[in-house]
Structure formats: C-alpha cells, structure tokens
C-alpha cells in the first residue's frame, strides 16, 4: 500500500495536490493520511482527487469527537492516526508510542509540531510528516511517504522543493528531513564551559 502522509496544511491544499499528482505518475497512491489542521482540507482533497483520505481533527479544528484519532488498516498491520496534541508530542513521543501499542498498531502518524520526524521505537514506526505550508524547522515544507507490504514497512520524509525538482527523485536520507543548524546562546556556553572541569 502506498500512503501519502500530510499534516497541518492550514487551508492550503495546493502542495498536496502537486505531490499527489507527481506520485501517482509513478504508481497509484492508495490513500492520503491527513493528520489534522484542517479537517476541511482533508475532505476537500478527497472530493477533488477522488482518492480515499483518512483524516483526524487537529487542535485548530475545534472540539473533541470520535475523529480525534483513528486506525488505518494495511497489509503490514494497523497504523494509528492522530494529530498529536492530546498525546503531548511537543514534549515526547512516548505517549503516542504507548497509544499505538495499546491499539495493536505497528505505527503511528501524527502532526501538530510542524516539524518532520521519522523514527522507530521497538519496531513501532512513528512518522510526523511536518507541515507543507507552515514548517517550523526551516525545511520549506515536508511530507511523508509510507509503502507497506505483508512483511515490510518503508518510510521517508521528503522536502517539498527537493521532491518537486525536475530530477523527480527528491533527496534527503531515509526517515528524516534535514535538521536546521543548532543555535546556542549563553546557557549553552555555560553548560559547555562547565563540562571542562
């Protein structure tokens, strides 16, 4: 199964449409996962593209409901879909990891932070596709791609500009977007200085 994973589009669906059309030329996208903010974007994408969009509400979609999280069934196993704000993903991935385990999932898709990440914790895949329209990591916008088989899960985070470049292959290493340069200040200098004793 070929799964396009996006989150935090905040009303701008154009990049998702561009990516979907390019991916579909290679082989059909089976499902788009939208991890919230905005749920209306997910519904509009499904209507416009004619592909199933599995979606959940985000913190900007208002209220609590049965669409705060859901399960996507694949041949490799189930994936939890959630926005991540209720699992406090800003601070740690532990809560989302445990929620995936509690629901017998092999992985979890989430958003909220606007920062892409792809990790595995004890063979549980955790993917945050970041945000295509409002990234907070200096990436210029990111999305995720997951391909599942009966005994396999392959995943990668792509930068939008790299993926849409004429070469068509995108760049970046498996499972992660390039990280911004770390900036430090006075506290960092103090901590580094204290390590010298």
Enumerate the language-model features and the residues they cover.
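Short, well-ordered coil/turn elements that cap or connect secondary structure elements
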Residues: 27, 48-50, 74-76, 121, ...
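Active-site neighborhood of phospho(di)ester-bond hydrolases with catalytic His/Asp-centered motifs
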Residues: 5-7, 31-37, 54-59, 80-83, ...
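Glycine/small-residue-rich loop that forms an oxyanion/phosphate-binding "nest" at active or ligand-binding sites
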Residues: 43, 48, 54-60, 66-85, ...
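Core dinuclear metal-dependent hydrolase active-site scaffold
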Residues: 3-5, 73-74, 80-81, 145-146
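Conserved beta-sheet core of the metallophosphoesterase superfamily
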Residues: 54, 85, 89-154
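Binuclear metal-dependent phosphoesterase catalytic core
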Residues: 18, 103-104, 127-197
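N-terminal active-site segment of His-dependent metallophosphoesterases
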Residues: 1-48, 62, 67-68, 139-142, ...
């Amino acid at each position: 199964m070929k799964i396009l994973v996006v989150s935090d589009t905040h009303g701008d669906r154009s990049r998702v449409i561009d990516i979907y059309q390019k991916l579909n030329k290679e082989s059909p996208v089976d499902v788009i996962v939208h991890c919230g903010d905005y749920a209306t974007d997910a519904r509009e994408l499904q209507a416009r593209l004619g592909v199933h969009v599995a979606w959940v509400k985000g913190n900007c979609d208002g209220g609590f409901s049965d669409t705060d999280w859901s399960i996507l069934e694949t041949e490799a196993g189930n994936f939890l879909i959630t926005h991540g704000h209720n699992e406090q993903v800003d601070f740690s991935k532990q809560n989302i990891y445990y929620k995936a385990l509690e629901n017998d999932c092999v992985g979890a898709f989430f958003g909220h932070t606007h920062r892409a990440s792809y990790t595995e914790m004890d063979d549980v895949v955790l993917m945050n596709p970041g945000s295509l329209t409002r990234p907070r990591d200096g990436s210029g916008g990111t999305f995720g791609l997951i391909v599942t088989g009966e005994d396999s899960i392959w995943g990668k985070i792509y930068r939008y500009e790299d993926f849409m470049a004429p070469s068509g292959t995108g760049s970046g290493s498996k499972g992660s977007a390039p990280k911004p340069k770390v900036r430090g200040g006075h506290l960092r200098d103090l901590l580094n200085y204290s390590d010298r004793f």
